[in-house]
């Protein structure tokens, strides 16, 4: 069945898979100390225009990455501010709470939180005479793009980062779908901007062409000591770290990572036009690879027998919001088929 259920329904981009096959019989050191991990890290630093004080580590998945970064960067009395719809708050099974970190959710707007809202939260917190009895805000977590496919502007990121510095907090950007954010035609943010407007972020591989894996980037001087030890303690250090290094080495060769993002955006725009031309309504305006369509429940039942897509939320008693996602594996034939059945 043709599927638009997510951007990780297929395996790896052919160029990534070829690199894995071509290097398969090479004997390499373990735990991320191999030459491909080193090469990928240097390519990422170059793409981000970061210096020698930046640090890059590879972790197998997004939830592990969020949990490790957040739990190792915060002190025991600190929590993390996030949107109420943020992945760490809504869809990670309490992973950060499992390690003793409280999520401090703020009401988001289409998945985004504002610098003003964060600033007000912190002012209210420190203005409370009882704040020593409360969880301190120690970090702000955002996603780029958000769970709703929306993106922050460069000014919005800059304002958030300034508020974080004002209140002595770290800014962490979840880049699970980073390729689609930086390559969106509506975005004025590029990889180098991400690298200068936060303390730590990660470059998503799993949802952007890799079999699995994310690349954590500490932008300079704030990487926790003995980070490899901390990754292993949390059960997330691969013995065959080459699996991640080889993939990211391929993704950051000849601009493959951004090419994957551009292609998925092009497919998403075509998908969006197909629905719009047929008179369908959208839940919100998404400039990235995730499109949120409002379906009549009867039509939903018909379509789900013919094509895969993701449930998002109930819209009314008779309508539902569903998500259609594109990726490197989406084809023109997939779109033509979709057009023929909706």
State each model region's role.
Residues 100-138, 142-147, 152-159:
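PLP-dependent aminotransferase-class I/II
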Residues 75-77, 269, 274-342:
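Conserved C-terminal alpha-helix-loop-beta "cap" of PLP-dependent enzymes
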């Amino acid at each position: 069945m043709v599927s638009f259920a997510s951007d990780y329904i297929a395996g790896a981009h052919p160029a990534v898979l070829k690199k894995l096959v071509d290097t398969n019989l090479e004997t390499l050191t373990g735990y991320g100390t191999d030459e491909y991990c080193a090469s990928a890290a240097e390519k990422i630093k170059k793409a981000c225009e970061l210096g020698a004080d930046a640090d890059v580590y590879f972790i197998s998945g997004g939830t592990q990455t969020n949990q490790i970064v957040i739990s190792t960067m915060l002190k025991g009395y600190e929590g993390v501010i996030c949107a109420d719809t943020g992945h760490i708050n809504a869809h990670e099974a309490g992973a950060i709470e499992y390690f003793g970190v409280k999520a401090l959710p703020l009401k988001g707007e289409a998945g985004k939180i504002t610098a003003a809202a964060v600033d007000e939260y912190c002012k209210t917190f420190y203005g409370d005479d009882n704040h020593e009895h409360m969880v301190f805000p120690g970090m702000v977590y955002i996603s780029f793009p958000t769970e709703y496919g929306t993106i922050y502007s460069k000014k919005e990121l800059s304002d958030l980062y300034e508020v974080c510095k004002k209140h002595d907090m770290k800014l962490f950007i979840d880049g699970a779908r980073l390729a689609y954010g930086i390559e969106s035609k509506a975005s004025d943010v590029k990889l180098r901007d991400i690298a200068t407007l936060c303390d730590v972020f990660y470059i998503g591989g799993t949802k952007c062409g890799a079999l699995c894996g994310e690349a954590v980037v500490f932008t300079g001087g704030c990487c926790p000591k003995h980070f490899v030890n901390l990754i292993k303690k949390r059960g997330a250090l691969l013995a065959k770290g080459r699996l991640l290094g080889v993939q990211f080495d391929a993704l950051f060769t000849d601009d493959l990572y951004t090419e994957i993002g551009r292609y998925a955006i092009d497919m998403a725009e075509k998908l969006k036009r197909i629905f719009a031309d047929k008179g369908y309504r959208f839940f919100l305006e998404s400039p990235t690879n995730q499109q949120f369509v409002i379906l009549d429940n009867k039509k939903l039942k018909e379509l789900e027998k013919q094509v895969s897509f993701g449930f998002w939320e109930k819209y009314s008693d008779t309508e539902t919001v569903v998500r259609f996602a594109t990726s490197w594996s989406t084809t023109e034939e997939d779109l033509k088929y979709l057009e023929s059945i909706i």
